[in-house]
C-alpha cells in the first residue's frame, strides 16, 4: 500500500473488520508481523500487509476499504495447492544508539500557503542543519498548534531511513518500529527520531503534503 496522494490520509481496513498483518513499512520488513484491523497512511507512507484468506470459500469477495470507499476487491478462487504460514521473525533491526546523542529540533507551523519549519520558509541557497556522516542524532519534530490551527504533517527525510523513538514520550506502535522515512506528526504532538546518514551530501526534509512542501515547509541538511 502506497499513499501517493498530495494531501489525503487513508485508513485501510477489511470490510468485515477482520484482522490482517502488517509485515513491512517504508524501509522494508518489520521484525515480526503486527496484527491490525486498520492502518493509517499519510502522504508518502507505505505498508505491506498480509490478508489470510484461509477462512473464506471459493466465490467469496474480500474488500479493502477506506471508510465507505472500496480500494481493492479480492476475489477468492480455488484452494491453493500449497499451504503457507506467516513467519514469526521477518527481520533483525539493530537499535540505533542514542545515549549522549545531539538533538535537533524542528517545529512545523501553519496551514495552507502560510507554512514554515522553525519560523523559516525554504531557501535553496540556505543550509538549515549540519550533521556528521554516520552520526546518530535525535530529530525532535513538533507539530505546533497556533492561531492558524493545525493538521497532520507527514514529515519526510531524503537520503535516510530512521527509527521512531517516541510519540509524546510514549513508545511508538509496533508497526512504526521498523525503518521509516516518513512519519505522521499529529497536531500538538512531538515525535523523536533516531537519524543516521550513511552518505554525504545535501538532503531535503519536508512535509509530504505537496501544497505545504511547495509553499516552503521544507529545509536542507548537509551531511559531511
Walk through the language-model features, giving the residues of each.
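Histidine- and aromatic-rich segments of cupredoxin/plastocyanin-like copper-binding domains
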Residues: 2-100
Amino acid at each position: 500500500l502506497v499513499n501517493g496522494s498530495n494531501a489525503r490520509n487513508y485508513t485501510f481496513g477489511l470490510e468485515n473488520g477482520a484482522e490482517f498483518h502488517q509485515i513491512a513499512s517504508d524501509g522494508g520488513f518489520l521484525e515480526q508481523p503486527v496484527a491490525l484491523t486498520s492502518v493509517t497512511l499519510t502522504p508518502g507512507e507505505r505498508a505491506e500487509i498480509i490478508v489470510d484468506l484461509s477462512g473464506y470459500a471459493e466465490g467469496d469477495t474480500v474488500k479493502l476499504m477506506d471508510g465507505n470507499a472500496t480500494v481493492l476487491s479480492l476475489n477468492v478462487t480455488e484452494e491453493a495447492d500449497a499451504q503457507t504460514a506467516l513467519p514469526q521473525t521477518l527481520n533483525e533491526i539493530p537499535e540505533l544508539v542514542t545515549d549522549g546523542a545531539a538533538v535537533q529540533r524542528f517545529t512545523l507551523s501553519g496551514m495552507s500557503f502560510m507554512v514554515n519549519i522553525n519560523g523559516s520558509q525554504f531557501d535553496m541557497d540556505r543550509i538549515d542543519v549540519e550533521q556528521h556522516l554516520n552520526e546518530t542524532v535525535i530529530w525532535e519534530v513538533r507539530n505546533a498548534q497556533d492561531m492558524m490551527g493545525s493538521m497532520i504533517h507527514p514529515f519526510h527525510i531524503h537520503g535516510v531511513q530512521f527509527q521512531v523513538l517516541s510519540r509524546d514520550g510514549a513508545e511508538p506502535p509496533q508497526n512504526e518500529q521498523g525503518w521509516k522515512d516518513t512519519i505522521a506528526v499529529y497536531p500538538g504532538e512531538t515525535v523523536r527520531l533516531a537519524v543516521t546518514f550513511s552518505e554525504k551530501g545535501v538532503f531535503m526534509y519536508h512535509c509530504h503534503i505537496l501544497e505545504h512542501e511547495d509553499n516552503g515547509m521544507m529545509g536542507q541538511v548537509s551531511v559531511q
